[in-house]
Amino acid sequence: MSGNTLGTLFTVTTFGESHGPAIGCVIDGCPPGMALNEADIQFELDRRKPGTSRHVTQRQEEDKVEILSGVFEGQTTGAPIALLIRNTDQRSKDYGNIADTFRPGHADYTYWQKYGIRDYRGGGRSSARLTAPTVAAGAVAKKWLREKFGTEIHGYMAALGEIDVPFVDWAHVRENPFFAPNAQIVPQLETYMDALRKDGDSIGARINVVASGVPVGLGEPLFDRLDADIAHAMMGINAVKGVEIGAGFASIAQRGSVHGDELTPEGFVGNHAGGVLGGISTGQDVTVSIAIKPTSSIRTPRRSIDKAGQPVVVETFGRHDPCVGIRATPIAESMLALVLIDHALRHRAQCGDVAVSTPKIAASAP
């Protein structure tokens, strides 16, 4: 099975399965000399970990990270950084009834057809459990970007099912389990999720992510455009079915006189481009939105087939997120951080000595 590595100069290779002894990743290409300890990574993992509210999976994983290599006396050495997260609360017996059947909307059928073998325990390699190593690697990337450029990456839930979540303030995001930027709407979200869980069903979500303090010049046209790599990484998150950069699909209805962000000596007027022009960062906020589909593992009876191709009815029991989007915010933030650090290192390698007389204008005009 290939396709387990992200990045060019700053690479992340993840490993493990949902019900295996451990999951983790190996980071290669991290610059030396950055202060790093397990607490730096644990903070981000705690934002993603399961069992934090009644609205997410009740699997109780501590998600305690162990740094196995690449850090000496509290600093990165430039060697590969191996990060390990042990699985401690597997309940594989919950999946015995789907060993020979395929859950609708899940990777069961395609994994079986492609590899001829499938770890049915919690989805194995296809499980959202494997986003934990991504978040761990993203914590390293976030720290380097923050210290090098002052880059800050924050996300929030913009919609839960048919409920739009109007943005009020970033301060609200860390105060509720939905990562909602609006405290007043949280009771409505809780009521909605309680009813959904009672019905044995699931729902999708929309997550917005913003990276501020991104330097101008990141991105490699034509096929390694910054926005192309962002979309590639975001689609690598379990259950993501759509990605928008900037105005995204709303650009269809915008005229050029509106969509094109004007430049003035004082700064850009607007950011419909989402901080990327021609595949290269403008120095403005990089804005990304992702659509997350409903969880495939639900108690509602669904039609499917077994390995023999015979019709069956599938009901999935066990501990599942009725909406994986609730815990997706730190995952999306991490993916964006991994793309940005990789392109920052690539830009430094090729164009670090480039200088032009044109001044860099502000991200937004006053």
Swiss-Prot record:
Gene3D superfamilies: Chorismate synthase AroC. InterPro entries: Chorismate_synth, Chorismate_synth_AroC_sf, Chorismate_synthase_CS. FMN binds at R125, S126, S127, N238, A239, G278, K293, P294, T295, S296, S297, R319. SUPFAM superfamilies: Chorismate synthase, AroC (SSF103263). It is an enzyme of class 4 (lyase). It comes from the Bacteria. Its cofactor is FMNH2. Homotetramer. This is Chorismate synthase. It comes from Paraburkholderia phytofirmans (strain DSM 17436 / LMG 22146 / PsJN).
